[in-house]
Amino acid sequence: MPVKVVSPYGSWASPITADIIVAGGLSFSEIRVDGDDVYWLEGRPAEAGRSVVVRRSMDGQERDQIPAGFNVRTGVHEYGGGVYAVGSGTIYFANWEDQRIYQVEENASPQVLTGLPEIARGDRYADLTIKDRKSTRLNSSHALTS
């Protein structure tokens, strides 16, 4: 057993470092079911906090549905809240970098659905849902007025 050492408050070396705290593990949120597939949003600290939609198919295979270069996150709720929707195998998501909505299907590149706002990142989307096979969303617009 190690010998106990009494030290003044704040003067001892802690085995818990900042690197240990921020390293963290993966986070999982926004679980969705589409047919036999299960989807979730996976936060990845090792990828600068990037969030990716992952699909688990009926055969147990897990696969990223969003390619590198995209971060599924919205500026409306910042860290979550209806940032993607899935229906009939098609995923609709908000991308952090430009706050635009994209559509992606299995083995395809994401296709942008919304235009460029007048102000960079000025339009923000959240609470994505699918109704009658169409993606609907809440739009929060940030504009300059004079």
Q: Residues of each region from the PLM?
A:
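Multi-bladed beta-propeller domains
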Residues: P2-S27, S57-G80, V104-R124
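Short loop/turn segments that connect beta-strands within the blades of beta-propeller domains
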Residues: D34, G49, G87-S88, W96-E97, ...
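Structural motif
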Residues: A46-V54, D98-Q103
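Hydrophobic alpha-helical hairpins/lids featuring a short glycine-rich hinge
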Residues: I91-W96, L116-L128
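Single conserved hydrophobic/aromatic residue that forms the stacking wall/gate
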Residues: K134, L138-S146
